[in-house]
Amino acid sequence: MFKLFIIGLVGGLLSGLLGVGGGVIFVPLLTYMTTKNFKVNTGISSMAIIFVASASGFTYIMNGITLTFNILYLIVGGIVGGYIGSKLTAMIKTKSLEKIFSVLLVIVSIRMFLNGNFESSFNENPFFYIIIGIVTGILSGLLGIGGGIVRIPLLIIFGGLENIVAQGFSLIATIPTAMTAAVTKLKGNPELIKQGTYIGLFG
């Protein structure tokens, strides 16, 4: 329990300080501080992200972020992608997943360096939101991340959303995406579900 508390607390603090999603922090901490393998940790991380994203998303809504109908397309794409990514996890070797995760960390570093400054072009085509949802959902299901580190720039560039609106969209879409990934990976294992819940609540 203490390790889960530390993982949730440290993950939550670093996520807030660095402006990155919880999964980018939770997965490495779980891998370092527990004896579970990488694939299991991605499922636990997805479970934790449900709670972290719910709290953050609620804050954005309370602060007046307006959600358009396009959020539904993003959510549908995320659910489909989350399921696909979760199924792919079982088919890909652990070492390969770890390498993919390492590449993601490099992308995170680059995005932090760019400080979220992206040129955008307004687009209301639902197709773009569905594709963005699927692509980021696959990453979420595959690696146990929220997907915002990729989803937000795509929403700004292809959806023409302002940064703060894109963040709100991303957080809301993360919740059902992470739920899909967590249920697919952890179904039938209440102990792992409980661990992910604790981390999410502590975060």
Predicted features and spans:
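Small-residue hotspots at the loop-to-helix junctions and early N-terminal turns
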Residues: 42, 46, 163-171
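Membrane-embedded alpha-helical segments of transport systems
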Residues: 47-55, 172-180
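Juxtamembrane transmembrane-helix boundary motif
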Residues: 1-17, 25-27, 31-33, 38-40, ...
